[in-house]
Amino acid sequence: MRFLKSFLVFSIVMLLISGCKSAQNSSTKQAITSPDTSLQETASSTAPAANELSPSISPTPRVQKTPSSSPKPKNAKWIYNRKTHVLTIKGTEEMYAEQTEDWIDNERKFDEHNGIQLNFNERKVKEIVVKPGITVINKGAFAAFRNVKKITLPNTIKKINDYAFYNCQSLQELTIPDKVVSVGKECFFYCRQLRSIHIGKNLRTIGNGSFAGCKNLQSIELSSENKYLETKYGGLYQKKQKCLYFQYQHTKTAEIAPDTKCIGTFAFTYNTPLKEVTIPDSVRRIKGGAFCYCRNLECVHLSNHSKLYKIDSPYGEMGMYPDDLWYSGSFLHCKKLKELHLPNSLKAIDWDTFSGCKSLTLYLGSQFTNFRKSQIAGVSAIQVSPHNKKFSSKDGVLYDRHKKTLLNYPEYKTDQTFVVPKSVRHIQESAFRANEHIENVFFPKKLKHIGEGAFNGCKKLKNATIPGKQTKIGRSAFLFCRHVVIHAPKHSEAAKFAKKHDRMFEVFRKK
């Protein structure tokens, strides 16, 4: 009897435990499957018609890690008419981009999870009409709508965020309403068919590179009541800071307003016709990317009376898509730029300012004091003012004042053979880096050290003659120099280096 009672108690306990586990498993399964179910229910109950995209299941951009991190649309409906190819936006407050996590060749693909077809393709849209009530055009809202020719914005719009019309390649004209106070960065980037734009009376600030790549923009019509901006000399200027936002008139010779203090980010970018520009003495700052990709620019005039004190570092990432991230120095890839005389007021420049300027001879002023290899990368020759107390030059090569250290052998210097001056005791790190012309280099006998990466990427280098027995060599000095032969005395430091790092070696014999 006692055994029977114990068995009954044990059975009841096991049944309870089994029930709890089954309940837990069912709830777990429900939790796992509930998103699909709820999505299907949403699709069936609130499925958009053939000409409507429901914001309740709007995808989110890849630039945001998870869908939950994207702000939810507030009372905004996207209605697409297949017959007229007109997309109409209705609602109130902020309007957010209808985007998924998938970006392929700047084309957004809309959500088809669980067999749901959203019946919308931005490539087909030819006109966008935003109805009154919407107050903000949010980040990337119409980015890459490549066939849109016309966009109508209501007077209720107060703000246009970053990349809003990015890469709308067919857009021809646009009016920014009077209530808009700010336009985000790269808002109209690469709208290459944009010919005219009207700016309302309250627009105060325009983000970096908003009009970069708008190579057909011929006119910017500014409201006569706008107190913050002005158009003159073929450019759009910020009044208070006297900054050139964008030079919209693309001519062979550019004229900048004489009272300008700043040349803005991407102000002249992709200005293909530009061959010559004179920078007024009043300009104190040139921002990153200001003249990048001006492929026909040959001459930039800067006088010795210039007040220029800063050429900014590259602007940094450009573009809202992960594949579009790139960097742009102020004169990046100005391949035809022949010479540039930096004024005495300029003490330093930032990295990669002149990258890709294959024809450039760069003249450093008397007050230039700050140097790193990356700052002057991409030029063909460097000349230094004889009054400079820190640097000197010879045959287009940069040295310290007393020519004890070779600092920079220009990337695009075309000589095949180079003899290092006898006074040189040190070769700076990365001094010859990426020069693809040099084949033979002869070092002086009293050279003490060749720095790390000194000849990194010098692919045509064949012979390095090092006559000194005590010349030490950095481990990566000849990185990616696959065909170089080191010529040095037997049992010298250079011979030891060659043996240790498996470099081709020949015993140097004085002729």
What is each stretch, according to the model?
Residues 10-14:
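Alpha-helical transmembrane segments
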Residues 16-19:
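C-terminal motif of bacterial Sec signal peptides marking the signal peptidase cleavage site
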Residues 1-6:
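Positively charged n-region of N-terminal signal peptides that target proteins for export
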Residues 84-92, 122-136, 146-159, 169-182, ...:
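Structural signature of tandem-repeat unit edges
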Residues 138-141, 161-164, 184-187, 208-210, ...:
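Consensus positions within tandem repeat domains that build extended binding/scaffold surfaces
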Residues 32-36, 42-48, 52-70:
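Ser/Thr-rich, Proline-interspersed low-complexity disordered segments
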Residues 21-23:
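Bacterial signal peptide processing site
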Residues 67-147, 164-166, 189, 267-269, ...:
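Surface-exposed repetitive/solenoidal architectures
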